[in-house]
Structures are given as C-alpha cells and as structure tokens.
Amino acid sequence: MATAVETLDKLERRITITVPLADVQAEVEKRLKVRARTVKAPGFRTGKVPMKMVAQQYGYQVENEVLNDKVGRAFNEAASENNLRVAGFPKIEPKTDDAAAEGTIVFNATFEVYPEVKLGDLAAADVEKTTVEVSEAEIDKTIDILRKQRVHYHVKGEQSAHGDGGSDLTAKNGDRVTIDFVGTIDGVEFQGGKAEDYAFVLGEGRMLAEFEAGTIGLKVGESKTFPLAFPADYHGKDVAGKTAEFTITLKQIEWAHLPEVDAEFAKSLGIPDGDLQKMREDIKVNLQREVSSRIKARTKDSVMDALIKISELDVPKALIDQDVERLMEMTRQDMAQRGMKVSDLPFPPELFTEQAERRVRLGLILAEVVKANDLQAKPEQVKAQVEEFAQSYEDPQQVLKYYFSDRSRLAEVEALVLEENVVNYVLGKAKVTEKPVAFDELMSNNAQA
C-alpha cells in the first residue's frame, strides 16, 4: 500500500509504502517451499532437506527478494496511478520513526520526476548558419597536403634519381635529420634526455623550438652545445620549468622530395587514367562533402544553443548523475583503446557534470520538440542516411549490411535523423543569419563540433 505523493522540491517527490509483514512471511514461506525441492545437503536426498535447514540457509536472501519485489511493485503502481514519469531510480529506505502500524514495515521512496518543458517562441530564436566556398585555391592547398603525405627523403649531397638536394649541405627546415643528443640539468643526465640515431623533421614542431634552432645550420659530423629552457607546463614533470644543457651531434641530413603533380600522382589518388582534371574534380567533391559535414555540425550546435536559450525546464539530478557515469565509462574505454592504463588515472565526476547537464537538458528539449511537432525519424529517412554513410566507403553494400543487420546500430542512425529533423524544423522557424567563414577556419581541428 502507498500513501499520497509528497512534493519535496521542484522535481523531488516522496511516496511512503507500507507492507504487511504477514504478506511478506506468506510469500517467503511459499518461495522457500519451491526452493526446497532442489536444495541439497549432506545426509539428505535432493528435495528432502528439512524446511528449518532450508530457512536457515536461504531465509534472509529470500526475505530480501520478497521485500524488494513488494516495495517495487507498490512503487510502480503508485507512480502509475498518479501519472508520474519517474526520472532515474527511486531511493528506497526503511522509515525510521514509530509511525508504522503493528504488523507492518514502512518504506520511504524518494525520487525525481521528469520536468515540464516550456518551449519558447522559435520565431524569436537566433541561429547562425555557416557558409564556405570551396575554391580552386582550396583544391591547390589540398594537393600540396597530399604531396607532403607522399614525401620521400634522400641523403643530402648524394646523387639520386631526383638530384642531390643542392649545394647547401647544412640542416634547414623541411630536412629530416638524424642526431645523437644528451641533456643534463646541473651536470646530471635525466630520464628521456639522451638518445642515439634519433630522427625528426625540422619545422614539424615535434621538438621544442629551441632544440630545433640548435640543430638548424649544422653539417654532418658537427656538434653543438646549447641551453634549453623547458616550459613550466611541459609534459615531463621532472624537467618542467627547468633549464637543461644539450649537446647534439648531427649524423645525417636528408632532403625532402615531393612527388610531381602528374599522371602517376593522379593514379596514386585513385584516378585510373591519371587525368589531372578528373583528379581535381574528385578532390573538390571530397572537400565539399567534408565542408558540408562540418557546416551541418556547426549549424546543429547553433540550433541546440538557441533551443536551450528559449526553453525553460528543471533538469533532474538523477538523469545528470546517470549521464556522468556514461561519460566516465566512455572516457575509460577510449583511453584503454589507446593503450593507457586507466586505473592510474583519476576520473572526478565533476569533470563531466557540465557536459552531462547540457546533454540531458538537450535530450529533454528535443523530445518535447519532436512530440509537439511529429518529427519522428521515418524509415525512408533512415535508409537514405545509411546510404549516404555508405557512399564514402569502398564497399557500400557491406556498410548497408553492417547497419541493417543490427537494430542498435540502426537506432543510432535514427537518433541522428531525428536530430536533423529538429534542426531543419527550427531553421524553418527561427531567425537565420548566414555567416561566411574562411575554408581554413572551418577545417581547423577546433572548428569541428
């Protein structure tokens, strides 16, 4: 039996549940009799163990099961009768005061309910829509990047099929150098401060700028000693903020040869006949696909920000806590896949709270927008989205099979389509401002949502 619902806070509720002990005892005895049929004990045949022994061994466990079942059933019935949408799981505790009637046990179930979501006027929402032009200059830049990805090196000063690298035999930006080095702090070598035959490309930023500067201008066989100040935020905590002295010896210099933009280069990019114009058109299509994806992500973020701004709701803490746990687990799995020892890393929940609160808030808002405007994902939309994914792979049919053979994978696509439906709906109602953005800005790493 459950009492009326008490309101403790905006979303917090409490129900008091009373369970007659006679009902509990009757159910316990019933379950123990069923269990006794299969209980084994030394000196007794299966199913012939005395009930007293069965009760001694299993009574406490069965009583807990019965109480959990009865309290859970009473809670669910009370929530249903009062039309309550419970957010998360209730906290159920025995009531400690003396209000319980004789022959009963009383529990308090404290929980949160889903909030009322008040959607504002979409016509008053401001949404920014990014626009980007893919020009010939962007195609040229991409070709340069593709050339650098296919770079190969030749020893400077030695004749090769592509020349000897010129008369300047000193190390300069773009060269790959091989060195021995040793570093000391106050005359003492430190961990990670010594290496032999260490190769890196000057100008790529793999090494600290002062280290690269100490290498530039040297010839093979030359050595140099110079001071190097480690930044205070350097990843090596033992040397961060300290000044070391490095001695380097240059052992080899290799100059970079970039492939010519010719038919062979085009073939290496998947153009069978090596036609350079086809290559440029293919690059443009790929760039436009990537630009479209990033613009869509930016626009979606702008729409979500607008929805948050115009909507009013209280977010259940229980749902935030659940999402914090999900984010923590996702982070652990991601780090483990990268080979990191997760057990050595702290995961304070507060690191994820802000992100979880936004995710939960948006989820509640989106659900309300979808329900109010009938924006559910339609089967043909889901199919079209999967086919779009498949086009960027070598074997589209395998991708289609991958999604359509697993309901959970298809559900992920449905969620994306649903979000897109909401975005398109909001764009049709809100005040949309187009914002031209430079190609490089859009494609920079921190531009992707």
Curated annotation (Swiss-Prot):
Chain segments annotated as coiled-coil in the UniProt record: none
* Claim: Cell cycle is one of the keywords in the record: yes
Major site of localization recorded for this protein: cytoplasm
Any single Gene Ontology cellular-component annotation: cytoplasm
Catalytic function, reaction form: [protein]-peptidylproline (omega=180) = [protein]-peptidylproline (omega=0)
EC nos: 5.2.1.8
* Superkingdom of origin: Bacteria
Gene Ontology terms: biological process: 'de novo' cotranslational protein folding; cell division; chaperone-mediated protein folding; protein transport; protein unfolding
Mind listing the UniProt keywords for this protein, alphabetically? Cell cycle, Cell division, Chaperone, Cytoplasm, Isomerase, Rotamase
Q: Which InterPro entries match?
A: PPIase_dom_sf, PPIase_FKBP_dom, Trig_fac, Trigger_fac_C, Trigger_fac_C_sf, Trigger_fac_ribosome-bd_bac, Trigger_fac_ribosome-bd_sf, Trigger_fact/SurA_dom_sf
A Pfam family the protein falls into:
Trigger_N
Q: Name one GO molecular function term.
A: ribosome binding
Enzyme superclass (EC): isomerase
Q: Where in the cell is it found?
A: Cytoplasm
List each copy of the PPIase FKBP-type domain by range.
Answer: 174-259
Q: Which PANTHER family match?
A: TRIGGER FACTOR CHAPERONE AND PEPTIDYL-PROLYL CIS/TRANS ISOMERASE (PTHR30560), TRIGGER FACTOR-LIKE PROTEIN TIG, CHLOROPLASTIC (PTHR30560:SF3)
Q: So what family is this one in?
A: Belongs to the FKBP-type PPIase family. Tig subfamily.
NCBIfam families, per database record = tig
Entry remark concerning the domains of this protein: Consists of 3 domains; the N-terminus binds the ribosome, the middle domain has PPIase activity, while the C-terminus has intrinsic chaperone activity on its own.
Described purpose of this protein according to its UniProt entry: Involved in protein export. Acts as a chaperone by maintaining the newly synthesized protein in an open conformation. Functions as a peptidyl-prolyl cis-trans isomerase.
Name of protein: Trigger factor
Q: Write down the species.
A: Janthinobacterium sp. (strain Marseille)
UniProt gene name? tig
